[in-house]
A protein has these predicted regions:
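Short, positively charged low-complexity motifs
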Residues: 5-7, 18-19, 29
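Residue-level detector of intrinsically disordered terminal segments
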Residues: 9, 29, 51-53
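N-terminal, intrinsically disordered charge-dense segments
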Residues: 27-46
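Glycine-rich hexapeptide-repeat left-handed beta-helix
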Residues: 47, 51-65, 92, 98-106, ...
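N-terminal segments that cap or nucleate solenoid repeat domains
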Residues: 52-89
Length: 221
């Protein structure tokens, strides 16, 4: 991404609205522009605080984030991104919906440093109670309910990871993963079926993360 220059107009900030809060609002709610363009953050009235809007000639739809979802301060949400109730985006994670929609289902977690991005015609769809591990990359793929993508794994365009499946850490997934199976390697291959208790534990793991996110957000899950 090209170097971006930001101008922050804060002269009309209302009392009690911090610069950090402004930055968070800019990440969550505003259109973005092409990397080559100069971006100006312009204040606008929202919820008692002046909100920074990233303006430019090519804005994308604003994110839609449920009131009970949690986004860490250092995470980035751009464009056509939808986050359902109880979902969470952890520190330095990126959901960039500038080319295609990204949807994150209820109770799903996108952990530290993970990246979600799509290509035209290849959106990212994350189901319910899904875990995406630290530094994983999900690009133009579908993760069905209850699956888990391990640390540093990569899931590429057009792939569907079936419900309850487990992608081992560091794997590169280039083809569909059957539901309830363990895949590993680069390229990833099916190693075995998962027992029902392992699939259930993945679902519970996602629920634990949802509760942890709620504690970070200081809300009741």
């Amino acid at each position: 991404m090209g170097r971006l220059r930001f101008e922050l107009r804060t002269s009309r900030l209302k009392a009690g609205c911090s610069t950090a809060e402004l930055a968070t609002r800019a990440r969550l709610g505003m259109p973005f522009t092409a990397p080559s363009e100069v971006i100006t953050q312009v204040a606008g009235e929202t919820g008692g605080c002046r909100t920074m809007v990233m303006t430019g000639s090519k804005p994308w739809p604003a994110p839609q984030i449920d009131a009970d979802a949690w986004v860490a301060d250092s995470a980035v949400v751009i464009g056509n991104v939808r986050m359902a109730e109880g979902s969470s985006l952890w520190p330095t994670a990126v959901a960039r919906g500038d080319l295609e929609q990204i949807s994150i289902g209820a109770g799903s977690n996108v952990q530290d440093g993970a990246v979600l991005h799509g290509d035209p015609g290849q959106p990212v769809h994350i189901g319910v109670n899904v875990t995406i591990g630290h530094r994983a990359v999900i690009h133009g793929a579908t993760l069905e309910d209850g699956c888990l993508v391990g640390i540093g794994a990569i899931v590429l365009n057009g792939v569907t990871v079936g419900a309850g499946a487990l992608v081992a850490a560091g794997s590169v997934v280039t083809r569909d993963v059957p539901p309830g199976t363990l895949v590993m390697g680069a390229p990833a291959v099916v190693k075995r079926d998962l027992p029902p208790e392992a699939i259930e534990e993945q679902r519970r793991h996602a629920q634990r993360y949802a509760r942890l996110a709620a504690s970070h957000a200081q809300i009741t899950p």
